[in-house]
Each structure stands twice: as structure tokens, then as C-alpha cells.
Amino acid sequence: MKNKSDVIFSEVVSSFNNFFQDQKKSVDLTVGLSGGVDSMVLLNVLYQLKTKLNLKLSAIHIHHGLSKNADHWCKLCLDECVRLDIDFYQKKINIDNSEGLGIEAAARKARYQILHQQANEVLVTAHHQNDQAETLMLQLLRGSGLKGLASMPLFDKERRLWRPFLKLSKEIIEEYAKNNDIRFVEDESNKNTEFDRNFLRLEIFPKLINRFPQTIKSLGRSADLVAEGLNLNKAIATEDAKNYFSEDFNKLNTKIFSTLPRDRVINLIRWWLDKNQQKMPSQKIMDQIYAQIIKAKQDAQINIHISSKMSVRAYKDFLWLVKIKKEKNSFDLIWKGEEMFELPGSGKLLFKSSLGKGISLDKLGSSVLRIQNRKGGERFKPERNQPTRTLKYLLQKINMPPWERELLPIIYSEDILVAVPNFGVHHEFVADEDKIGLTIEWINYESKI
């Protein structure tokens, strides 16, 4: 029978070979090192396997400053890395809880952002089987969908994140630490049952395990099965997406609502939001999106907030992801020859000289160009043989969504609307084919997710 240390080494080597078997050169791993028993054991195990697996190791410690002992934790991590001759980095961060996540969740979010920024080729964390069980239970209690219930993958390809201990119990890790004299710290906040995860770990799981001894393994297995279902849904959505998406995945063709069954539609919308790195909205909001589109008339302008910063809007047979703008900026600015002109809250303008294109500098004469926001009611005549039209009508003809029309900057000379960036130039001011003209491109930050 294998001893507990052998079990750890065997699991890590097996996991490594599954994900890095095609690697021709050394694998560059950065260990997320908190100073706790799990991460300190992970560092030691990878150090022992360094030669066998051809590893290049480094470690990073995130200093939250939330504990009076934080400096001590950092020093312990540094001392251990010096002892093992492993490159060590530490990063101090301030916790931003403006999103109302709570200190625990906000700290976790900030920690992962820094870890991924600082990590080399692959980030390695010491999450284990008990962590997975706790995560699944928390997601169940929140009423999460498949993505939440799948919990933590062993290897996250997109984020280059490896969790080699995920199939190992906390008990095995602690025994390894004891048998190998691993130095580690105890975070005093782990005893605080005001935090949901600690409450489950200290109050609920002991009772579950006493009644159902296989609780931890069973929950881990359930998370694996949910992950398989999630992967199947992703594969179906990827196939469906080929027929219903724009190239940049910013908008979704609403034809899906009449050609696909409801569950496939919801699945594709979830995939779309995930593809654009949006937090998954509640089932109530998903039902609202579906119901409003099904009932909507051709010209309906649907606007459903899926978070404090993003909304799903409908226009001209498409669903769009649109940033929520708190207020419209008003401006009246003079162009002084800049190649790039930053606009208040609505992107920037790029000015270029082009032969036979854009605004004629000769026809403009000494008049200055004024850059203004739209106020409504503007009229424009880009074609000599066409009547003057309202700008709204002309922009509707090119299917510009109303939220972009609201932000669109326009260019005046005296009282004449001479140019609309990304659309056209007043016919009387168009540059002749053999003359230098001024082209103006609008880059709309608000349309970028």
C-alpha cells in the first residue's frame, strides 16, 4: 500500500503528464504561495519533482494587508524560497470592495488578477478535494447554473491555471506536511464563521462527513460530472454559433429565437455572455431576455440590464452587448490640427490627410472645424442628387444602433454640418479627386466590451 507521500507524488506526476505530455522544453510554473499548509506543501512537492519533470519554478505571494500577521506570512514564503533557491515575487494590493462582493470575494478576485498578471507560463495553485466540495456546496446554495456547479477544473486552458492537488484530500496534504516538517502559517480568518466558506467547513461539513463518510469524494465526483455536461453544452453552442454570430461575437442574430428550441437558445446566450467575459446573470434575467425577444415587434428596442455595467439590447434582428452609460456628455470643441482627438466620454477621432477623400481643405478655406455631440434634429446632405435628410434617417438606413447614434460626434464649419465620421461628407465639401482631403474616423470606446 502506498504511503501518503507516494500518493501525492503519483497524483501530481499523473496530472502533469496529462496536461504537459507534448511539452518539448522545460515547463515554467509559478506557484501561488500564501504561506498556508496547502501551498507550502505544493511548493515542496514541485521542488522534489523539479528535475524529474523538467520544471522551472518560481513563486508569488499576494500581500493583502488584511491581517496584522501579513508581513510574517510574506517573510515565511520568502525564507522558504531562498532555502530552496526558487525565484520569489511578492505583490502588495489594496482590496476594492466597490462592487459589493464582500471582503472575502473581493480579496479573492484581486488576488487572482495579480496572480495571472505576474505568473510566467502556468500558474499553479494548491486547491484540493475539500476546497472543491466547499465550492460546489456554495454554488448549490446560490442556485448557480452548470458553470458554477462545475466548480474548479483541474486545468484551465484559457487562464493557464493548473490545480494538481484537486483530487487529493486535505488530510493527505496535512500528513505530508507533518512527515516532512513543512513550515506554514495559519490564517486566523479561517476560523471566522462569518465567512460562508468557513461556516461550511467548520460547522456543516463535519456533520455531513459523520453521517456520509464519502461526502468530500462524492461532491468532487458530482462536480466532475457537471463539468462534462458543461463541456457538452459548450460544444453544442460552438456549433450553433457558426450560424448566428458576427465575427467579433459582439452581436447575436435573433433568428435563433424562431429556429432553435428554447433550451438551445438559452445555452447559446450563456455561451455568448461567457465568451465576452460577462458575469452570468440570474435565471430570471435570462427568462426576461427570452420572453421579450419572442414577443418583440420588428422595431422594438429592448434594453435589459444584466449587470451594473452592461446591458443586452435588441436592434434590427440582433442582440447586442452594450456598456451602460450613466449620462450623455455634451461638448463643443475646436479642432486645431491634431491627428488624434480625445472626446469626452465617447471615444476619439483620428484625422488623416488623403488624396481625393474626405473634407476638401480648399473648400473649407479659413473656417475652423467644430466637433459637437448630437443634439437631435440635425439635417445632412451627403449626395448632390439626393434631398437633404435628417441625420437620424440616414443613420437608420445604415443600421447604426440608437445607442451609437446618441454618442456619435459630428463636424461643423460655421453653421453647416460638413461631416459625420464613419459615414460621409456634405456634398459641397467633398475633396476633388486630385486634391488633398481630410478623413475623420471615429473610434467608439463604448462599443468595445
Language model regions located:
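PAPS/PAP-binding and catalytic site of the sulfotransferase fold
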Residues: 176, 200-208, 263-275
